[in-house]
């Protein structure tokens, strides 16, 4: 009875009404929740949901804002109705509402209209006749309603074809009469409907083949509709109407009678074809309709085809261009749509071909013959597609197809060529390629495989690129070779296949030679390789080649392929393919070649195998060309057949027509002919061929010109005189032509360019002739060449490439002289200095040079010129001083060139260094002059060695080091002009060269004196570079110093005359060399350590005189533009003074000090100046300093008050002095004690203190008096600049310093909170410096991170962090610091007490070993928990709970008592600290200490769980969970009651907005689980839903938990009461959680008392919340709760409830009050 009573009293209709009303809520979350609940309810009581939806829908869209949602719910509810559950009257009302809404607007596709249509379709599944009647009513109504009604019928047909199709007659009877009045804008809807209806009929017929729905009436309607659509709509002016009509007609053609179809064809076909003319986007739709039409007309089983082929020609002619449209879509539109259109067109042609194969074949061939690109392209594509499918029908037509394809071979359209190429491949696969025509087709593929983008074949509007065409042809050619032979051949076409093989071989050999096929050589070679590989075991290839006279001879093939090897990086692995073919064709050549190639070809293929690796070698092209020339030369050598060599030469000579002059292959061809002529003994033949080479060469192209010159050089190796004769003829003919002379009068550019090219070519040819000519015969030729004025004529060239050629030629002449000297034919080069002037002239840039000349070319010219200068300087006679200076003036400036482009600049700089070394080696007559020459060069380089630009310093140091290396070899063992090491024929010994003329002179004439080297000046110049920022500069400069001292010690009696100990000097030099060895082997070594060792070694190697000279010259070094180098110079000076200062006289010390002071004045960098002052302090170490100490401190105080010390140029000198004092052993201790005493007896000034009137700095410090201010600055300086000595003094007073700074930090933060920031900044600076001084880097980071935070929590935490850091790093200091701070708790200043408490609360953690101090600290902390400052109270409490665990056991009861008292503190921050501390204490406290006050703690924690502070709530929940382990004795029962009272609160906060609260509740629930007797709680709390942050998972967990909780019926009452209280929580998400928890328990509870007591209360609350709450999350929870309660109600009475008229009317007036 109770259940029935409850069921009858459930206000289900009201709840459903609220849910329906919520469909118009502003929040999407609420709308979705309401929709989900209504779906659940609709599955149980769909009629109630429909009643409520019906109630709100009667007002329409004007009264309800989300009619789309209402219609969606209604559609689902109707779908949930069981058969017979609803009456047709009510469904009729719903249908009327839906139709009324649909027709109320002229819109046709709004969201609410679509949902209303869905409702009608759902109604139609139950009452199709009712739905159709409703629609039929409006079909005859206003014209605006009919389209929507027709669309609904179309949707119904698509969704339920089996019910719709039997009623098609009625639909057509209603729709047909109104078709004539349908407006154009609505006709697409009607046409689409007929399409859907036709599809439904086809589906019905497919599923139910026994009964046909197409009776005579239906056919009559369909025929009449078909006629209307065809005659009227298909010719409408509206494009959309025509498109939709054709789409519909395409579906209807299979339903109408054959008679009507035949009569309709004359109109229907043009209507479809008309679509192709307007918009290409409609091609797919039109083609699909056309395919349906063709199937119905041609392939019908009811009779013969309705269309003759003549009738189809217009159709087929229209379809052919569509293939091109598809090709266009591949670029500009959707690829899938284009591909579908293409396939539909092919299906149309296949349909026709199945009926009229021969006619279609003839039609397609005729279209090809028209040679109209779109038609031809389409026809070729169709032929390619249909040839395999209609092969048997078309087999007899093969000659016609071959002839037609042959006629298209000259077509220019790339698209047609591509289609024809594809067709050729298909024809080949079906054995169409036979006889001469087959060769034509193969040649066609080869020719188009050679097409390149540069051929300009892609005309405007072309859709196919040359690249695409080339790819298709290349693949097709390979397919003919590889794939087709693998196909299974029938007996019928086996002979045809053999003919195809005969066509390919040896016909493909003809494709190698012609120029037009050059781009296809790789593909051809690959095909030849495959053919040779497959046929190697059958017919001998040699016989087949010789059997055909049109095949090129072997010499022509060999010469062509060798030249084509030029590019190793060519596409398709051209070089490797050619080498493979040569290997297969080796039987065609002389016998010995085959064996040689077996070894050589694999090596060459291995070189070009990895092209990516090949690219890494910048000289790969030159290397590869040399390999080709060597390959050719050795091939010629092994043949030993002079006639064959002559024949090969003739073949090479004929190939010039195959290559353009600017093609690099032409240059290689020159060289090939040159190496071949080198092997020929017939001088007349050689003369004829070099004339031919020169005639064919285009010397205006640098590459061609260079190839010609190298070829002439190769010929000169065997025929020098013949080559020189040719060159003389060329020289004599330069400018002698009458035509040229006349032309030059009118065109200066013609004269210049033509002359430049000829002179450049001549110069190169002379140069390479000298290079390759025998050394024994070149002296006279070179003398004759130099002795004439021919070289001077070459200076007038202006093009950079021409200049480079002339320079290269001069360089080759010089190298020829050097090479001759290597073979023993030594002779001087006449007019060498004049030739140097020529090079310098060519190297300079002409002021009139045009902008067309690239700067890169100028740099390349200069690099070549430097190289040539080096060559000329290295030959006899010796270089004069004037020439030397002229060369250096013209070249040294290159050191200042920028780094980019590096590939050009780097070789240029290397050539310059080599030139300087060559100048040094070839200059001077004795030791002194050579040393002076060295110093002259080095001083010229000083500006670059000390340059501020990194790469200039590196270049300068490299140059210095290279020259020193050369100089050392020169002094010790002579030199070689070519730089050879060891004994060589051109080495010149100093002693041997001097013996003849200077045997009686002192050794100074043979060896330089050490003083001449000026080591002091040189050392201080290069020493800063040893500390350079560039590692390479450091390494090189160290080697420079090593070379200097190695040279000095290698000189005769160098050590004895210097006053140094010989053994110590060599030890120092050995140490320096060890450092250099380390630098070379280990780049990670500390640079400062390396520099120290270098300075130490040098200090021992310098003589007294050199030391003084270095100190006197140190100003420039200390002022070096590189900071690190300047620091190194200062360090070196300090080392020199410290170690060898006793050797300095008073005058020397004075001058050295003057140099250091001068440097310090010029140094603006503060740190560098401090280091300079440190160097001065090292000189004054033995002077008195006590008076200076007092005066500096007083002066500093005055400066602080009266000056802006932060803006003094170069920094504050007094601070630098502080640094200097702090670094003295005796002064540092006294200085620190004095500063600490001032800090302890002084206090910070108030905010009204200020500086003098002259103060202008905004960052001035505010301290009590001048002395205190100076002391703080001095203390900071002491910490920062004291070094090891200062650090020792600080360590001695560590605890005093920390205590004072900590207390002052509290005072400064107090001042900062009132707006006075400066004292805090000054103190933090000093504190930071202290951290750096004592090495507490972590403490320094803490200060830097949080030091300036003025919030109390931040600075209190800062002091705690500092205390913790000190405790870890320096535990021995903790006791003394704690004693100082414990006493400070009694100070009257609040901020100092807070600072002391903050520090002690952290220090106490590390004071367990100090029992007496611990007792004193605990007593003080307990006493001050009643301090006036809340901060002191909570910090004291925090300190108490942080004492070591060993000590805590003695004070646990006392600490817990303090916590219990502070849980009721009036300050919330103290309460929060108390809760946090309780958590900490419970980790180790015993039961005896906690159990007596367990319930008191629980009650207070429950009160704190409703705090607005999320941290407080989280900690309160966690603390209560932590107390659960103490509920073991008499307090267990009381604590369990506390748990049950708290459990609902834990559950609703389990999905709190704050993540910390969520985690705390999870942990606490797990701890409570053993006490509340939940079965299988481990499975519940270990589930994924319990730990998830997703709300859905939370709701799932609540459902699972509720299943366990409702089993204890006596507790459910308590849970429900507590949960309902949470309905009024201040947090919306907690309200939502409480709603869900309570409704879940109610839905699962079996206790009728609980249900009867709380069900109405909760339901009423949900209604109230739903209508009044402003929070969407609450309204969404209410919506879900309604669904949950109604879906799970134990009573089924409400499931039959309906919404009565009175209630619905009343509720309808209340809907406006619902929150939206």
From Swiss-Prot:
It is found in: Vacuole membrane. The keyword tRNA processing does not apply. HEAT repeats lie at residues 10-47, 144-181, 220-258, 263-300, 317-354, 381-418, 499-537, 552-591, 626-663, 667-705, 737-774, 785-822, 830-868, 910-947, 1013-1050, 1089-1128, 1148-1185, 1230-1269, 1372-1409, 1412-1449, 1451-1487, 1492-1529, 1537-1574, 1592-1629, 1653-1691. GO terms for cellular component: plant-type vacuole membrane. GO terms for biological process: amyloplast organization; gravitropism; negative gravitropism. It comes from the Eukaryota. Disruption phenotype: Abnormal inflorescence stems gravitropism but normal hypocotyl gravitropism. Impaired flexible and dynamic structure of vacuolar membrane (VMs) leading to altered amyloplast sedimentation. Keywords: Membrane, Repeat, Vacuole. Expressed in roots (e.g. root cap of primary roots and vascular tissues), hypocotyls, cotyledons (including in guard cells), stems (e.g. epidermis, endodermis, phloem, developing metaxylem and interfascicular cells). Involved in inflorescence stems gravitropism, by modulating vacuolar membrane (VMs) dynamics in gravity-sensing cells (e.g. endodermal cells) during the amyloplast sedimentation process. This is Protein SHOOT GRAVITROPISM 6. It comes from Arabidopsis thaliana (Mouse-ear cress).
């Amino acid at each position: 009875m109770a259940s029935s009573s409850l069921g009858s009293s459930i206000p289900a209709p009201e709840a459903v009404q609220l849910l329906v009303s919520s469909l118009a809520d502003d929040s999407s979350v609420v709308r979705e929740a309401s929709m989900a609940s209504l779906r659940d309810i609709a599955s149980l009581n769909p009629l109630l949901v429909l009643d409520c939806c019906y109630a709100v829908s009667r007002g329409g869209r004007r009264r309800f804002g989300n009619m789309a949602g209402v219609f969606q719910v209604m559609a689902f509810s109707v779908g949930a109705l069981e058969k017979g559950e609803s009456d047709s009257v009510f469904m009729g009302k719903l249908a009327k509402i839906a139709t009324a809404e649909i027709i109320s607007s002229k819109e046709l596709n709004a969201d609410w209209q679509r949902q209303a249509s869905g409702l009608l379709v759902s109604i139609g599944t139950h009452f199709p006749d009712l739905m159709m009647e409703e629609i039929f009513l409006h079909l005859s109504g206003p014209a605006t309603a009919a389209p929507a009604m027709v669309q609904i019928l179309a949707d119904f047909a698509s969704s339920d074809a089996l019910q719709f199709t039997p009623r098609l007659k009625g639909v057509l009877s209603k729709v047909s009469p109104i078709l004539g009045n349908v407006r154009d804008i609505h006709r697409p809807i009607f046409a689409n409907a007929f399409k859907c209806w036709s599809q439904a009929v086809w589906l019905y017929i497919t599923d139910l083949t026994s009964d046909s729905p197409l009776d005579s009436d239906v056919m009559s309607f369909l025929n009449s509709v078909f006629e209307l659509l065809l005659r009227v709509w298909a010719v409408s002016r509206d494009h959309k109407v025509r498109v939709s009509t054709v789409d519909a007609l395409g579906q209807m053609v299979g339903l109408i009678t054959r008679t009507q179809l035949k009569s309709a064809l004359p109109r229907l076909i043009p209507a479809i074809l008309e679509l192709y003319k307007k918009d290409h986007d409609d091609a797919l739709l039109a083609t699909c309709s056309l395919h349906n039409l063709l199937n119905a007309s041609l392939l019908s089983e009811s009779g013969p085809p309705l269309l003759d082929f003549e009738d189809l020609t217009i159709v087929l002619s229209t379809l052919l261009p569509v293939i091109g449209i598809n090709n266009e879509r591949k670029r500009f539109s959707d690829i899938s749509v284009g591909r579908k259109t293409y396939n539909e067109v092919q299906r149309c042609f296949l349909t026709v071909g199945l009926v009229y194969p021969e006619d279609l074949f003839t039609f397609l061939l005729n279209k090809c013959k028209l040679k109209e690109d779109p038609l031809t392209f389409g026809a070729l594509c169709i032929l390619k597609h249909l040839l395999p499918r209609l092969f048997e029908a078309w087999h007899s037509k093969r000659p016609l197809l071959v002839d037609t394809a042959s006629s298209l071979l000259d077509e220019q359209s790339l698209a047609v060529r591509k289609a024809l190429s594809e067709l050729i491949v298909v024809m080949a696969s079906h054995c169409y390629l036979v006889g001469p025509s087959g060769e034509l087709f193969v040649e066609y593929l080869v020719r188009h495989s050679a097409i390149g983008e540069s051929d300009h074949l892609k005309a405007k509007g072309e859709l196919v690129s040359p690249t695409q065409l080339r790819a298709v042809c290349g693949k097709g050619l390979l397919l003919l070779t590889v794939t087709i032979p693998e196909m299974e051949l029938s007996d019928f076409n086996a002979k045809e296949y053999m003919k195809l093989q005969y066509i390919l071989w040896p016909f493909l050999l003809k494709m190698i030679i012609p120029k037009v096929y050059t781009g296809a050589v790789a593909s051809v070679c690959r095909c030849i390789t495959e053919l040779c590989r497959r046929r190697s075991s059958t017919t001998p290839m040699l016989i087949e080649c010789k059997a055909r006279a049109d095949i090129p001879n072997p010499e022509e093939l060999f010469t062509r392929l060798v030249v084509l090897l030029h590019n190793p990086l060519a596409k398709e692995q051209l070089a490797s393919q050619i080498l493979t073919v040569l290997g297969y064709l080796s039987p065609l050549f002389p016998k010995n070649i085959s064996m040689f190639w077996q070894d050589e070809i694999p090596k060459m293929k291995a070189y070009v195998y990895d092209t990516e690796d090949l690219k890494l070698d910048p000289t790969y092209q030159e290397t590869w060309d040399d390999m080709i020339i060597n390959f050719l030369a050795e091939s010629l050598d092994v043949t030993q057949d002079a006639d064959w060599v002559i024949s090969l030469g003739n073949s090479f000579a004929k190939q010039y027509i195959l290559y353009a002059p600017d093609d690099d292959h032409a240059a290689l061809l020159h060289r090939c002919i040159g190496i071949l002529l080198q092997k020929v003994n017939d001088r007349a033949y050689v003369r004829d061929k070099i004339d031919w080479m020169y005639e064919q060469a285009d010397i205006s192209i640098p590459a061609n010109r260079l190839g010609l010159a190298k070829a002439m050089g190769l010929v000169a190796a065997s025929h020098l005189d013949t080559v020189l004769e040719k060159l003389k003829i060329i020289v004599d003919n330069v400018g002698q032509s009458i035509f040229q002379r006349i032309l030059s009068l009118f065109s200066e550019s013609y004269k210049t360019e033509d002359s430049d090219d000829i002179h450049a070519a001549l110069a190169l040819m002379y140069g390479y002739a000298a290079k390759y000519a025998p050394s024994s015969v070149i002296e006279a030729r070179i003398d004759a060449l130099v002795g004439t004025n021919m070289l001077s004529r070459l200076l007038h060239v202006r093009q950079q490439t021409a200049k480079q050629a002339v320079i290269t030629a001069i360089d080759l002449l010089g190298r020829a002289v050097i090479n001759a000297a290597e073979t023993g034919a030594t002779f001087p080069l006449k007019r060498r200095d004049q030739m140097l002037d020529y090079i310098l002239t060519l190297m300079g840039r002409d002021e009139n040079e045009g902008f067309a000349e690239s700067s890169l070319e100028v740099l390349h010219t200069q690099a070549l010129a430097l190289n040539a200068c080096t060559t000329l300087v290295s030959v006899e006679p010796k270089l004069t001083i004037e020439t030397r200076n002229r060369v250096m003036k013209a070249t040294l400036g290159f050191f200042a060139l920028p780094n980019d482009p590096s590939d050009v600049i780097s070789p240029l700089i290397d050539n310059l260094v080599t030139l300087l070394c060559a100048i040094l080696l070839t200059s001077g007559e004795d030791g002194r002059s050579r040393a002076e020459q060295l110093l002259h060069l080095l001083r010229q380089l000083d500006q670059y060695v000390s340059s501020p630009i990194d790469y200039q310093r590196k270049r300068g140091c490299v140059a210095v080091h290279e020259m020193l290396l050369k100089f050392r070899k020169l002094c010790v063992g002579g030199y070689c002009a070519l730089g050879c090491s060891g004994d060589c024929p051109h080495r010149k010994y100093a002693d041997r060269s001097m013996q003849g003329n200077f045997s009686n002179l002192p050794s100074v004439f043979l060896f330089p004196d050490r003083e001449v080297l000026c080591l002091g000046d040189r050392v201080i110049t290069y020493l800063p570079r040893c500390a350079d920022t560039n590692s390479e500069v450091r390494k090189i400069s160290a080697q420079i110093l090593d070379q200097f001292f190695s040279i000095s010690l290698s000189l005769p009696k160098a050590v004895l005359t210097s006053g140094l100990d010989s053994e110590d000097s060599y030890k120092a030099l050995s140490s320096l060399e060890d450092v250099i060895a380390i630098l070379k082997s280990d780049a990670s070594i500390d640079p400062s350590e390396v520099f120290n060792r270098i300075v130490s070694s040098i200090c021992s190697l310098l003589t007294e005189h050199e030391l003084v000279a270095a100190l006197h010259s140190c100003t420039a070094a200390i002022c070096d533009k590189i900071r690190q180098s300047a620091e190194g110079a200062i360090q070196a000076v300090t080392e020199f003074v410290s170690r060898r200062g006793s050797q300095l006289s008073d005058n020397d010390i004075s001058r050295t000090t003057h140099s250091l002071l001068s440097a310090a004045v010029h140094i603006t960098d503060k740190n560098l100046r401090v280091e300079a002052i440190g160097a001065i302090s090292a000189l004054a170490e033995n002077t008195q300093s006590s008076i200076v100490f007092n005066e500096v401190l007083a002066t500093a105080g005055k400066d602080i008050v009266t000056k802006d010390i932060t803006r003094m140029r170069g920094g504050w000198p007094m601070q630098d002095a502080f640094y200097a004092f702090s670094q003295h052993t005796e002064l540092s201790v006294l200085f620190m004690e004095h500063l600490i005493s001032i800090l302890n007896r002084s206090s910070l000034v108030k905010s009204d203190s200020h500086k003098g009137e002259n103060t202008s700095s905004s960052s001035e410090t505010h301290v009590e008096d001048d002395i205190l201010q100076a002391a703080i600055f001095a203390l900071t300086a002491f910490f920062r600049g004291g070094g090891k000595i200062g650090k020792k003094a600080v360590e001695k007073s560590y605890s005093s310093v920390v205590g004072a700074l900590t207390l002052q930090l509290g005072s400064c933060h107090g001042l900062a909170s009132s707006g006075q920031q400066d004292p805090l900044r000054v103190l933090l600076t000093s504190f930071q410096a202290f951290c750096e001084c004592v090495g507490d880097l972590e403490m320094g980071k803490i200060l830097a991170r949080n030091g300036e935070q003025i919030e109390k929590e931040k600075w209190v935490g800062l002091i705690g962090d500092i205390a913790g850091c000190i405790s870890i790093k320096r535990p021995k200091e903790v006791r003394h610091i704690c004693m100082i701070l414990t006493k400070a708790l009694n100070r009257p200043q609040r901020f100092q007490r807070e600072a002391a408490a903050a520090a002690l609360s952290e220090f106490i953690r590390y004071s367990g070993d100090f029992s007496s101090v611990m007792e004193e600290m605990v007593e003080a902390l307990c006493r001050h928990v009643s301090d006036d400052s809340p901060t002191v109270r909570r910090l004291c409490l925090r300190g108490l709970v942080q004492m070591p665990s060993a000590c805590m056991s003695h004070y646990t009861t006392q600490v817990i008592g303090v916590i219990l008292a502070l849980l009721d503190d009036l300050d919330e921050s103290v309460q929060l600290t108390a809760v946090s501390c309780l958590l900490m204490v419970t980790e180790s406290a015993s039961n005896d200490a906690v159990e007596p006050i367990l319930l008191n703690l629980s009650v207070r924690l429950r009160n704190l769980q409703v705090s607005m502070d999320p941290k407080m709530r989280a900690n309160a929940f966690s603390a209560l969970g932590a107390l659960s382990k103490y509920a073991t004795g008499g307090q267990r029962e009381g604590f369990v009651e506390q748990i049950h009272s708290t459990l609902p609160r834990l559950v609703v906060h389990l999905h709190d907005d704050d993540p910390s609260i969520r985690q705390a509740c999870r942990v606490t629930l797990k701890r409570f689980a053993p006490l509340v007797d939940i079965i299988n709680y481990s499975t519940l709390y270990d589930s994924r839903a319990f730990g998830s942050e997703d709300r859905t998972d939370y709701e799932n967990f609540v459902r699972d938990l509720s299943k366990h909780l409702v089993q204890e019926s006596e507790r459910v009452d308590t849970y429900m009461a507590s949960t309902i209280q949470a309905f009024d929580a201040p947090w919306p998400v907690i309200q939502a959680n409480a709603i869900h928890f309570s409704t879940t328990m109610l839905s699962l509870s079996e206790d009728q008392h609980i249900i009867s007591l709380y069900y109405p209360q909760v339901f009423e609350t949900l209604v109230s919340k739903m209508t009044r709450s402003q929070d969407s999350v609450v309204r969404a929870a209410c919506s879900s709760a309604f669904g949950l309660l109604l879906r799970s109600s134990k009573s089924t009475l409400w499931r039959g409830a309906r919404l009565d008229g009175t209630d619905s009317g009343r509720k309808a007036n209340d809907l406006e009050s619902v929150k939206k």
